[in-house]
Amino acid sequence: MRFAVVTFPGSNGDHDALMAIRLGLGHAAELVWYTETDLSRFDCIIIPGGFSYGDYLRAGALARFAPVMSAVAREAEAGKPILGICNGFQILTEARLLPGALLRNASLEFVCDWVWVRVEQTRTPWTSQLAPGTLLRLPIAHGEGRYYVEAEELVALETNGQVVFRYVDADGLPTADANPNGSVANIAGVCNERGNVVGLMPHPERAYDRFVGGDDGLRILASVLSVGLEVAHSPR
């Protein structure tokens, strides 16, 4: 499979994602500059973390207007697997490819730590090889990671099975103490209605090697392989 890792001015997680795909999965990955307008040659797309455009206005607000995002939207419509990590998640919500918004952390502080997340849905390409309730230990590093939707939309997300990851403690319980940023309902990641576009605040690409902290993130990245190949070879 061939992965695109989209790079914006200010991205800093692009090389992490590149190495996770190349070294962790053993698949081809290419850095794609924000001016690119055609992503059809790729099987999967990753929008990495960082501070695109310096987070001016708010995180992801300017990146949504980059030329590459029109291409991302086309591939999302075609059903291609797309993963937004941290700032990539923020960009996808700003582009309305994912529901909700990412606000300042409840603490008003930048949070850098390791957290537990629980897999809530396995209908997405990025969780297809995981069992519901699987616990993953992943790193976080963000200042605007508090996921928010109105109460009515939260009910819809839960009903539609769009909550993909939830912050929990080591026992798998979604407690207040396990919530690092004040996200509504301890939500760490969501998907679109179709399930092919996923965004999460934790960094799976920084957890692909057990010798440098853990390899739970590799389980997310590896899940896309079988589903991604099916999409790549389906009629467009």
UniProtKB/Swiss-Prot annotation:
This is Phosphoribosylformylglycinamidine synthase subunit PurQ. Pathway: Purine metabolism; IMP biosynthesis via de novo pathway; 5-amino-1-(5-phospho-D-ribosyl)imidazole from N(2)-formyl-N(1)-(5-phospho-D-ribosyl)glycinamide: step 1/2. It comes from the Bacteria. It holds the Pfam family GATase_5. GO terms for cellular component: cytoplasm. InterPro entries: Class_I_gatase-like, PRibForGlyAmidine_synth_PurQ. Part of the phosphoribosylformylglycinamidine synthase complex involved in the purines biosynthetic pathway. Catalyzes the ATP-dependent conversion of formylglycinamide ribonucleotide (FGAR) and glutamine to yield formylglycinamidine ribonucleotide (FGAM) and glutamate. The FGAM synthase complex is composed of three subunits. PurQ produces an ammonia molecule by converting glutamine to glutamate. PurL transfers the ammonia molecule to FGAR to form FGAM in an ATP-dependent manner. The active site is at residues 86, 203, 205. It catalyses: N(2)-formyl-N(1)-(5-phospho-beta-D-ribosyl)glycinamide + L-glutamine + ATP + H2O = 2-formamido-N(1)-(5-O-phospho-beta-D-ribosyl)acetamidine + L-glutamate + ADP + phosphate + H(+); L-glutamine + H2O = L-glutamate + NH4(+). Its EC number is 6.3.5.3, 3.5.1.2. It comes from Thermomicrobium roseum (strain ATCC 27502 / DSM 5159 / P-2). Keywords: ATP-binding, Cytoplasm, Glutamine amidotransferase, Hydrolase, Ligase, Nucleotide-binding, Purine biosynthesis. It is found in: Cytoplasm. CDD domains: GATase1_FGAR_AT.
